[in-house]
Amino acid sequence: MEDEVVRFAKKMDKMVQKKNAAGALDLLKELKNIPMTLELLQSTRIGMSVNAIRKQSTDEEVTSLAKSLIKSWKKLLDGPSTEKDLDEKKKEPAITSQNSPEAREESTSSGNVSNRKDETNARDTYVSSFPRAPSTSDSVRLKCREMLAAALRTGDDYIAIGADEEELGSQIEEAIYQEIRNTDMKYKNRVRSRISNLKDAKNPNLRKNVLCGNIPPDLFARMTAEEMASDELKEMRKNLTKEAIREHQMAKTGGTQTDLFTCGKCKKKNCTYTQVQTRSADEPMTTFVVCNECGNRWKFC
């Protein structure tokens, strides 16, 4: 059963990526006949795939059936709150056609009641960790929420992770607004920098960490450019800082004046050099050269 649902999910994800929902209606009809459980929903992420099809499709029959499926699956997350509710749920199939959608929903619901509490606690961390962002009617804020959600859709990671990119975009915007309390230039620059970093093709890990909740929305809203940078850029900055410190130390300690080196810029031979052990002890020392005429610097091993 799980393999079949996973196969449906993969087909729908490909449809979304190719922006071609042909055949989606047949898949949705087959899904409707599968007795869904909370465990199956969580393990296959089929809900995210169906929701993505719903958003993209212009076919009213497809969107209507997708909405119906999502609505029925959401009932699995709620569960009856009392024993009385449970008894009522068990009695309802007796007065309902056995093959009707309602009967299948109730059958699935009653079959999973005993494990509901444990399964509810085991829901995806992302869904339960953060409260939903308050709604707003401010056109600037709404536009920023849309752009943040679009940035989170970069690379389609949100489909594989199963994140609600629209809600997450709203939470990030809400955190930014709560800190700045205005939609002025500071607010817009903050939003713009988040969007730029989320779309950065060289820094996909940042987007994935935000989508899966490793970086909470309120923390992401406050992160500096240095904190959002890719690991590669952080390493480059670290090396540049080390080299700047080394060159500063060289300038303070001086060096040995020589005419053995020719400056690549001014072609003069009035230079000062310093040798520093930058690698392991058995490796050659690095020679740093400064042209005393034009200030050009270079190094070699």
Curated annotation (Swiss-Prot):
A zinc finger (TFIIS-type) spans 259-299. The modification N-acetylmethionine is found at M1. The keyword Zinc-finger applies. Keywords: Acetylation, Chromosomal rearrangement, DNA-binding, Isopeptide bond, Metal-binding, Nucleus, Phosphoprotein, Transcription, Transcription regulation, Ubl conjugation, Zinc, Zinc-finger. There is a cross-link at K55 (Glycyl lysine isopeptide (Lys-Gly) (interchain with G-Cter in ubiquitin)). Residues 80-93 have a biased composition (Basic and acidic residues). Residues 3-80 form the TFIIS N-terminal domain. Its main location: nucleus. SMART domains: TFS2M (SM00510), TFS2N (SM00509), ZnF_C2C2 (SM00440). GO terms for biological process: erythrocyte differentiation; positive regulation of transcription by RNA polymerase II; transcription by RNA polymerase II; transcription elongation by RNA polymerase II. The modification Phosphoserine is found at S57, S81, S97, S100. Zn(2+) binds at C263, C266, C291, C294. It is found in: Nucleus. The keyword Nucleus applies. GO terms for molecular function: DNA binding; zinc ion binding. Residues 80-137 are annotated as: Disordered. Pfam families: Med26 (PF08711), TFIIS_M (PF07500), Zn_ribbon_TFIIS (PF01096). S-II binds to RNA-polymerase II in the absence of transcription. Belongs to the TFS-II family. NCBIfam families: TFSII. Necessary for efficient RNA polymerase II transcription elongation past template-encoded arresting sites. The arresting sites in DNA have the property of trapping a certain fraction of elongating RNA polymerases that pass through, resulting in locked ternary complexes. Cleavage of the nascent transcript by S-II allows the resumption of elongation from the new 3'-terminus. It is linked to A chromosomal aberration involving TCEA1 may be a cause of salivary gland pleiomorphic adenomas (PA) [181030]. Pleiomorphic adenomas are the most common benign epithelial tumors of the salivary gland. Translocation t(3;8)(p21;q12) with PLAG1. PANTHER family: TRANSCRIPTION ELONGATION FACTOR A PROTEIN 1, TRANSCRIPTION FACTOR S-II ZINC FINGER DOMAIN-CONTAINING PROTEIN. Interacts with EAF2. Associates with UBR5 and forms a transcription regulatory complex made of CDK9, Pol II, UBR5 and TCEA1/TFIIS. Part of TBP-based Pol II pre-initiation complex (PIC), in which Pol II core assembles with general transcription factors and other specific initiation factors including GTF2E1, GTF2E2, GTF2F1, GTF2F2, TCEA1, ERCC2, ERCC3, GTF2H2, GTF2H3, GTF2H4, GTF2H5, GTF2A1, GTF2A2, GTF2B and TBP; this large multi-subunit PIC complex mediates DNA unwinding and targets Pol II core to the transcription start site where the first phosphodiester bond forms. This is Transcription elongation factor A protein 1. It comes from Homo sapiens.
